[in-house]
Amino acid sequence: PVLDYHVHLKGGLTKEVAARQSRQTGVNYGLAINCGIGFSITNDTELYNYLDTMRTQPFILAMQAEGREWVTTFSEAARNSFDYVFTDAMTFLDHKGRRTHLWVNKEVIIDDEQAYMDMMLDRICSVLEEPVDMYVNSCFLPDAMSDRYDMFWTEERIDRFVNALAKSGKALE
């Protein structure tokens, strides 16, 4: 079977539309809900309520763990209620303690691009130690840096990332 592990219900994609598309294409969907501070699901009660509405649907259910505090925001029992859990390193505290969402340009404050890249790689390697099954959006760069991808993702940095990933035993999207 073919499976897309990272599908979100948004932009007009409802569970009904997703089910129909899945049947038509033969691709099974892992539906993910964003869970964390400032996201769709922010506590165990909301998480269980969401799961109650989805258990009868023809999908594998995933938790996309957001922010680095998700491990303490949600109980282990609640997290384990999903079929699998994945995360990325796109929400974190930067080197000055500012909450950063890498896709929100105004939150990405870069003084020194190479130092910022090193900080992002540190965050990625730390995230790989979190209790998840899969790491996603693996090498995302903010808009201010994305046009020079090869300059920032050097062989040395790639090696560090790949070694940390291998050590973690996690799947990579």
Model-predicted regions and their roles:
Residues 12-19, 69-77, 118-126:
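Short, acidic/polar
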Residues 49-115:
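Active-site gating/metal-coordination segments in enzymes
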Residues 27, 55-56, 83-84, 165-169:
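Structural alpha-beta junctions
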Residues 1-69, 142-146, 150-156, 160-161:
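An N-terminally biased module of ancient metal coordination in phosphate/nucleic-acid-related enzymes
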Residues 29-30, 85, 135:
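Hydrophobic residues within beta-strands of alpha/beta enzymes
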Residues 6, 85, 172:
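Conserved, mostly hydrophobic/aromatic
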Residues 81, 89-92, 101-173:
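Domain-core and long-helix interface of multi-subunit machines
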Residues 5, 63, 87, 136-137:
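Active-site flanking residues adjacent to catalytic metal/cofactor-binding acidic residues
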